Amino acid sequence: MKTALRIGFASVFASFLAASTAFAAEPAIPDIAAKAFKVGDLDLVSLHDTQFVLPNDAKVFGLDAGVEAVTTVLRDAGAPTDKITLSVDALLVKDGSRLILIDTGVGPKGGKLIDSLKYAGVTPDQITDVLISHGHGDHIGGLINADGTPAFQNAKVRMTAAEWEAIKSGGQADAIVAAITPQVETFAPGAQISPSIKSVEVKGHTPGHTAYEITSGKKTLLAIGDSAHSSIISLARPEWFIAFDGDKPIARDSRKELLSELAKSGQLIFSPHFPYPGIGTVKAKGDGFVWAPALKP
């Protein structure tokens, strides 16, 4: 698992960037975007960072299915068949006096998270907590500034103990580790992080990958992290392996189980890689699922 994480952080993130550059720009949404909404009495904001555009070459999606099978899924959904677009976003939770950020995007070299945060009326020094779903570069890259200093200097940075150990031992995030170590607090899967937020273990993607369930009264939202990546492919064919997953069979089983639960419950979710702002529900369709967005960009 730790080996998979090391490979994932370096080569997978590099493939993201290379593929995105190869496909130039997609003008779907502004570079800087902040979409506010509520869960019960809580104020939340979906923050845009960047997006990746990957070729449909079966090197990331459909590893065990092939290009033609992926093409069919994309065509059936009315999407372009030569490329797969993934958003990269973060979630801000305003919980009383606490400003809690879930994940941090790719960082200053390619992301606009800080600009989107400021557009929402919040400066980095106001963030009190940063919750990390897992240690891939498009989720922890924004923990440091271009000069290597902590981006959220007044925040506690929280993640599972297993994920922190994997990041430290991986060798691909040494600058981040050096900068944030004094800020890091770890927890066990399933821990209550704040009165409104609980971690939810979703195994397979990385050693300590976690989702976060946000609750206010009778309303809930699950920030799913990288439990699913494509709003089309990961839902239509959740059994297909994805290159990003460290333990692919376990990640597949976790994905199928989670999507089934979400379709039955109708629970609202935030997915950082689904089309921005990534807020919606999962519905059953045939042998798979479909994405039902609840908010427009």
Indicate residue ranges for each PLM-predicted region.
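Active-site environment of divalent metal-dependent phosphoester hydrolases
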Residues: 32, 55, 109, 135-142, ...
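Active-site HxH/HxHxD metal-binding segment of metal-dependent hydrolases
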Residues: 55, 99, 105-182
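Active-site neighborhood of phospho(di)ester-bond hydrolases with catalytic His/Asp-centered motifs
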Residues: 102-104, 128-138, 158-160, 202-204, ...
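Conserved beta-strand hairpin/beta-sheet module of binuclear metal-dependent hydrolase folds
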Residues: 30-119, 211-228
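Cap/insert and terminal regions of metallo-dependent hydrolase folds
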Residues: 26, 217-297
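Sec/Tat signal peptide C-region and signal peptidase I cleavage site
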Residues: 20-24
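Metallo-beta-lactamase
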Residues: 25-26, 38, 122, 126, ...
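Bacterial N-terminal signal peptides
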Residues: 8-19
